[in-house]
Amino acid sequence: MEKSSNRFLSIQTYMELLQEAQNKTQHKYVKDFITSYNFVVLPITENIGHRASIYIEEYSIPSGLRAGDAIIAATAVENNLTLISSNIKHFKSIKDLKFKGFKP
């Protein structure tokens, strides 16, 4: 991964990464990785919250979309970004989302 270009991360994704850490050393590793690879953490705005609630209404039943993933998708759409994720099941059906799935 090149360090020179900017990458964006929703605050929801950032919190999920920290939540998975088992100890303070892993917390530090996550923070250092985000900083060293120039990730910009994007906040939840009113528009993101509104769009995420619409996604929950539209996609939670047919595709199992949960609140956290709705916030992540809405953050990408509101910032005109392509979302890259291995969570293909939940994101592929969102019509206005630019999405690239991958298998780890």
Regions found by a protein language model. Give the residues of each.
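Short, flexible helix/strand-to-coil boundary loops that buttress conserved ligand/catalytic motifs
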Residues: 21, 95, 103
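Flexible glycine-rich beta->alpha loop in the catalytic core of nucleotide-sugar glycosyltransferases
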Residues: 82, 89
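Short, active-site-adjacent cap segments at secondary-structure transitions
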Residues: 16, 90-91
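PIN-domain endoribonuclease scaffold, especially VapC-family toxins
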Residues: 1-63, 67-81, 98
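Histidine- and aromatic-rich ligand-binding microenvironments
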Residues: 10, 65-66, 87-88, 103-104
